[in-house]
Amino acid sequence: MKRRITIALGIILTVFIFYCPNCYAETQPELRMMRATAYADTGKQTKSGIWPYEGVAGAREDLIGKTAIVYQRLPGNKIGELIGIYEIEDTGSTEGCINGHVIDIWCPNLDECQLFMNRVYEDGCQGKVFVQFIDTEG
């Protein structure tokens, strides 16, 4: 149920941003440019203690429990299409995740990781994406 609410909230937020950008400007969550990576099933639970599933990502520890809305970065630092909506339930093991420069998207296998990485590296954007973190707890 929480996942459905999170996805619905993300879709509503995305539609609102694109169709009423001036209405939303005062309360819009910070849009961050981050490097995106992908990881496959490790056979371990996430930092928050759950088993990973599609829609889970890793980021800095203080972001656990938040939802990340991830957009493609286009040349000229323009926002592209929605890549996905992810629940931050893990921290990742790289220094970039720990320091807040990387979002690490969970994929069920290495082939899916490669497809994800191909998508974020297209158009010469070097794996950079735009991310908004929203609080969906409570």
Regions of interest found by a model, annotated:
Residues 1-10:
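N-terminal Sec-pathway targeting helices
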Residues 23-138:
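Solvent-exposed, well-ordered loop and adjacent helix/strand elements within mature globular domains
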Residues 15-22:
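C-terminal segment of classical bacterial N-terminal signal peptides
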Residues 10-12, 72:
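Short intrinsically disordered, low-complexity segments
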